[in-house]
């Protein structure tokens, strides 16, 4: 058998599929990140080792700002190419909805690099608007205001507009339009009004119900006519600058996008025919990320189109309908936050230990006085072959069930139960090995690989770092960052360190279908083993929660140039004291309470003075230490 090659690992984990030229494997068998075409590749294993020297322990979230920059440039260049091809005569505006990742360093990097690309921000709530107005200092870039609004929200936006911000208030419900009219009159400002339209078209994938008739937001055709009459009656006809639609996040099928664009373009035409000179069409989000690298519409974690195809369809549809009706091309706004941010963040954590189902030692023989069920099961294991495997499987299951029932009634002892378990799982393993080599294996054996997978316990919280994996079964690319020049010899599910049975990852990307285990390597006592989760830059940080009081992980920002990489910033993860403070425990008060208790225990002779000091020292140290396990 030939030696395992790096190309085999590339195929196994499909890194060339989902990696989008950013991720690969080097000659050392390490995962590398190439944020820029003119920059170096960052070896993730070497980066983790350097961070360890700097006392930055895993789990660590690694952000690559250069990837953010590249994503902005990619989207902008796609629009430029499409504009030239289809004779588009208006402007495109890339808008970043900060709900996707509101972390200040992320937003500031997007704003900084996006200035020359007409990049603006979208706020979907009052707190987000407060952030957006302050950080978006470029007076030429757009600010789009979505979400539910009250008077203070609208007043803030209108006053910011009065001072020079290009702010658009998008009406989600009819009562908002009335509030905008009222506040605009009080403040003596001509508002830039947008209207979100509820299309009949919907997206595809997990967020299909975000669009269509079941959509939470938007005005129906009847409500739109009511809104138009209201604006005309209030002298606000010229204030309607924008129409907006959104058919859902992560749209998997380009056909759904095309259908929505055709429907939305007719609203643009009809409004112009009614004398409403709309200038902007905001096509919302929906531009998907190919998480599994299969370019397939059948997978919720993939998409069957490229950014260029998405942009081509957007521009060509609106150009075509505008030219046919003799109206100006609209300025096109896109809100593709997921596509901008997903690739730039990588979560890295260490595998702490493993758990494997018991197995029978090949050299072990059973004692003559062993229980008859043990002897019978041993005989099945000893004579197992392909011809008898289905019958053997049925017999093994029956014997195991009988043994467990006898144990529950106190008839067989613990030693016998343990022997039954070891033999049963050894039989199961051998049957699975035979079945995997068959072209047509019995259906009963399909779930055995999942059942037999090891458990790799990892130093992270699924709920804090990968909430979508738990909440909506989102599948992210996951693989070891080292030893990729070696053939993986184990199959495992990943278990986090929360005290919750849901804290696990048991679905992984596969070129054939979803896999229920991850190919990994046996652990070495002398070498830490790291696993990385990729494409986690969208939504995961901001949606994460503190289940079991695990806080934010350490985060580092890594930039690259022609000579190498630089660790630009290290953001310490949350301490135990910080997360306790979130849930209204005063750390200082906790220490004082413990000091009183320890003093009392010393006086009562329960512990010595030195033991009391040691306990308090450990408590204080732990209180201001990392919430994750430390070596």
Where are these regions (language model features)?
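Charged, compositionally biased N-terminal leader segments and the immediate start
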Residues: 1-31
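Short, glycine-/Ser/Thr-/acidic-enriched flexible segments
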Residues: 30, 38, 67, 101-103, ...
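Short alpha-helical segments and helix-capping/turn motifs at coil-helix boundaries
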Residues: 7-9, 73-81, 104-109, 129-130, ...
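Low-complexity, highly charged intrinsically disordered N-terminal segments
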Residues: 20, 25-102
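A non-catalytic, amphipathic alpha-helix used as a structural packing/dimerization or gating element
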Residues: 66-74, 226, 263, 313
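Flexible, glycine/charged-enriched surface loops at secondary-structure junctions
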Residues: 58, 62, 84-89, 274-278, ...
